[in-house]
């Protein structure tokens, strides 16, 4: 399937295995059980705290070469655990998104500044480095939110402010360029992505491959 950004998705029913023979997929014989498992893991705190994840000893296996402890049972426990950060997500932010205030603001802003943005930022790298979501833009967003029935909450607004700024910048980048640029902006606040990049560029990771 060809996608608008030039990438492609390939659907398959095949299973994928790591070099040590572990399937990266969980068993999904039952759709209900598969979805229920994710909900139970979230409620149990497994996505927020590594200490909440427990494996029975029967699933533990030592790799022959490096002697690392890995686990069977379907799916993979990562070598590095990055907890989900839920502090940025508030009801106020969710309502701004759900009521369409974020998209409406973005569309209005771009239509009012398209020529200016195109002339000022010829390349995404320049936009990424220099463009800043300022106070006037945020005030406009709050105003649109009020008109859409989203009651302003100062405490929740301050908590979600870093996410709101990143999201607005990413949506503007998407309109000016494409989805690749959208994710390049959004991923700056994605702790899993940032941790992965840190590890992949470290000597410690290279040692694990030997």
Q: Model-flagged regions — what are they?
A:
Residues 23-24, 28-210:
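Conserved functional hotspot residues or short segments at active or partner-binding sites
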Residues 1-33:
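Conserved phosphate-handling catalytic cores of large alpha/beta enzymes
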């Amino acid at each position: 399937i060809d996608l608008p950004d030039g990438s492609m998705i390939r659907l398959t029913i095949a299973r994928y295995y790591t070099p040590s023979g572990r399937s990266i997929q969980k068993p999904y014989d039952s759709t209900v059980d598969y979805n229920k498992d994710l909900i139970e893991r979230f409620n149990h705190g497994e996505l927020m705290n590594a200490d909440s994840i427990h494996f029975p000893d029967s699933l533990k296996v030592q790799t022959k070469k490096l002697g690392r402890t890995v686990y069977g049972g379907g799916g993979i426990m990562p070598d590095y655990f990055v907890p989900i950060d839920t502090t940025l997500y508030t009801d106020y932010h969710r309502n701004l998104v759900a009521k369409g205030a974020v998209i409406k603001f973005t569309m209005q802003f771009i239509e009012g500044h398209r020529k200016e943005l195109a002339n000022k930022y010829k390349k995404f790298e320049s936009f990424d480095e220099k463009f800043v979501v300022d106070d006037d833009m945020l005030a406009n967003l709050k105003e649109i939110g009020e008109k859409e029935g989203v009651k302003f909450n100062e405490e929740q607004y301050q908590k979600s402010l870093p996410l709101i700024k990143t999201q607005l910048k990413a949506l503007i980048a998407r309109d000016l360029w494409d989805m690749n640029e959208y994710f390049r902006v959004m991923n700056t606040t994605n702790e899993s992505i940032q941790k992965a990049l840190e590890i992949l560029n470290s000597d410690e990771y290279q040692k694990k491959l030997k």
